[in-house]
Amino acid sequence: MDIHEILKYLPHRYPLILVDRVVSLELGKRIHAYKNVSINEPYFSGHFPHHPVMPGVLIVEALAQAAALLTIRSENMEKDAGQVYYFVGIDGVRFKKPVIAGDQLVLKVEITRQLKGIWKYSACAEVDGQLVTEAQLMCTARAI
């Protein structure tokens, strides 16, 4: 799934679209996606000058966006159908290594549970095959 298709499903836009490509998607199970981290990211001007490090909260947001794509596609949710998909909880976040300009984040998200409109996921981000972030995420769809 390229960026044009991603934009059909996610409501996010610049500067907060944090998934560049989906490389594999198993409906109802898992997704693998990429976020290419460029020196042109707006947050690098302040985090940190002369040592650009991607804020951990944005790595988690990238994982949540990948989770949203997985669920929106798995559940055949329509964009602009009077509902929005919210990130509602997070547990066990660990940041193992910094992510810097030039890195490619590999986002891996797996559905672990779905109950009463709440989806739970096991998520991790890797750079060059090394774990940089891991977390348990929770999301839900709500009427707007």
Curated annotation (Swiss-Prot):
Gene Ontology biological process terms, A to Z: fatty acid biosynthetic process; lipid A biosynthetic process
Enzyme class: lyase
Catalytic activity: a (3R)-hydroxyacyl-[ACP] = a (2E)-enoyl-[ACP] + H2O
The keyword Transmembrane helix belongs to this UniProt entry's keyword annotation: no
MF terms (GO), sorted A to Z: (3R)-hydroxyacyl-[acyl-carrier-protein] dehydratase activity
Highest taxon in the source lineage: Bacteria
One Pfam family matching this protein: FabA
UniProt key word Coiled coil: no
List of catalytic residues: H47
Listed EC numbers: 4.2.1.59
Cross-referenced Gene3D superfamilies: Hotdog Thioesterase
Role played: Involved in unsaturated fatty acids biosynthesis. Catalyzes the dehydration of short chain beta-hydroxyacyl-ACPs and long chain saturated and unsaturated beta-hydroxyacyl-ACPs.
Similarity remark: Belongs to the thioester dehydratase family. FabZ subfamily.
Full protein name: 3-hydroxyacyl-[acyl-carrier-protein] dehydratase FabZ
Organism the protein comes from: Nitrosomonas eutropha (strain DSM 101675 / C91 / Nm57)
Lineage, top ranks: Bacteria, Pseudomonadati, Pseudomonadota, Betaproteobacteria, Nitrosomonadales
